[in-house]
Amino acid sequence: MKMNRFLLTGCAGFIGSHALDLLLSHGHFVAGVDKMTYAADEENIKRHESNPNFKFFELDICDQAGIKNIIQENNINCIINFGAETHVDNSILGNNCFIDSNITGVKSLMENCKDLNIPICHISTDEVYGPIKDGSFSENDKLSPKNFYSATKAAAEHIVCAYANTFDLDYVMVRMSNNYGPRQNSEKFVPTIIRSLKNNKKIPLYGDGKNVRDWIYVEDSVKIIYNIIQFTSFNNEVYNVSLCDERNNVEVIQTMLDHFGLEWGDCVEFVDDRLGHDSRYSITNHKMLHLIDFKTTSFEDGIR
């Protein structure tokens, strides 16, 4: 069955709002849920307030009864869960909200999947694999998270799988690499670079700047996720979502400086490294390649 009536959590956030745009552009009905924390932006949903296929609910995904009412009243036939706390630095300062949203919130959603027999697309992260020195992780590799954020995301995956196994539920799991693009919260690396350059301030660079991440433009990411939802029949599988575009932080900054026509010079300030900073994330993308039916965006084009 093709999914056409979605409960979309985190719809006012960075990636979730792009998923909202895409779902509505395909004519689907979306009941959007967002707790409206600092990482959400009202403008991300305002543009759709006159669309009859969109309803917005300011709600915490931990509110199991509230979510259940939304699902029942709007004939939802699929949940897409982007709702999460995601900033690693924040998880080091305090991890209670990460446990609430990323673990308890997922447990709440899975209770509704069980009670109402609804499939879920759970959005996770490549960070659940932990760092890797050489090679890349595939979907079958074990999880070995090394920070509080990735630990809560790994726990959430286990909760989804446990519910599915125990109660015969359908799901699909997506492990994304580093997204960037329009609407990203200012705390993230690429927006920090842009903000620093525009304000004539130095770009803070952790450690030696050699930490490697795998970058993907947000609109490419949500298109792939949409195709996973529509064409994989919720087969209780995991899909890495990556374009295998690995760059260390120095290279990312240099690309941004080239874009703005600036020299390295005094633009960068090396700062103390993040506690427990993972050196490199890398995932394979063989499993999802056949789902890319569009021209993907290079990093150089994505930052324009």
Language-model segments: what does each one mean?
Residues G66, K107-N112, W215, D220-K223, ...:
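Conserved mid-core alpha-helix of short-chain dehydrogenase/reductase
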Residues A154, D170, N179-T192, N199-K202, ...:
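Glycine/proline-rich active-site loop of Rossmann-fold NAD(P)-dependent oxidoreductases
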Residues A155, I159, Y163, I193, ...:
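Hydrophobic alpha-helix immediately C-terminal to the catalytic Tyr-X-X-X-Lys motif of short-chain
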Residues H259-I283:
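Terminal hydrophobic/aromatic helix or amphipathic segment near a protein terminus
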Residues V218, V250, R274-K295, D301:
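Conserved C-terminal active-site "lid" loop/helix of NAD(P)H-dependent oxidoreductases
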